[in-house]
Amino acid sequence: MAERTAWRICRDNGWWSAFGKRRGRGKNARAGPPVHDDLVRREFTAAGPNRLWLTDITEHATGEGKLYLCAVKDVYSSRIVGYSIDARMKSSLAVRALEAAVARRGQVAGCTVHSDRGSQFRSRKFVSVLARHDLVGSMGRVGAAGDNAAMESFFALLQKNVLDRRTWATRQELRIAIVTWIERTYHRRRRQRRLARLTPVEYETIMTPATALAA
C-alpha cells in the first residue's frame, strides 16, 4: 500500500484531529467494576467470522507526546476489522474503533465483543454502541492479562515490527506507519500458523467464499 493510500485512510476516518494534552486517568489506572460477564473465559476460537471480536488499547510515545491505538480483532481470521488512532485516550477512541468494525463487516448482530475493564469499554457511549448493533459485551477479570491474550499477541507484533523499530518524531508519521503495517503487511503478507499458513485476508477469502467480507 502506497503512503498516499495510508494518508487517505487516515483522512477518511477522521484521524487527523487536533492534538491536546492527555486528560483523565490512563489505561493502567485501577479498573472499575465490569459492565459485562466474562463470556469468553480464554476460549479464543470462533467457528466463523463475526462470532467473536477482541478489542483493546495500546499506546506509544512520539516526540509530540503519546499516540493511542484501539483495535478490534476478529478471532476467526485474526483480521483487524476496525481501529481508531488518536492523541487522547477517551471513550470516543473505543467507540470509533467499534463503529469502524461494524461498518466494515455489516451483519454483526450476536457477535461477542470481549475487552478488559478499562473505562473506555465501560463507558455509556461504548455500551450504547454495543446495544445499537445487537452486539454482546464480555469483559475479562481484573489483573488477568491472559483473559485477552489473543489481542495482546497482536499488539506484541505491532510493537516489534513498528513501534520499537525507531523513534517517532511526530504522531502523524507513527499513524501512517501503523496503518500501512496493518493494511499492507499484517493483513496481506504475514502468514499465520493457526490459519494454515495463510494471511488473514487469504483465510477469509478461501474459508468463507460465500461471505462478502470487505478487503
Predicted regions and their residues:
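Charged DNA-binding/catalytic regions of mobile-element recombinases
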Residues: 1-215
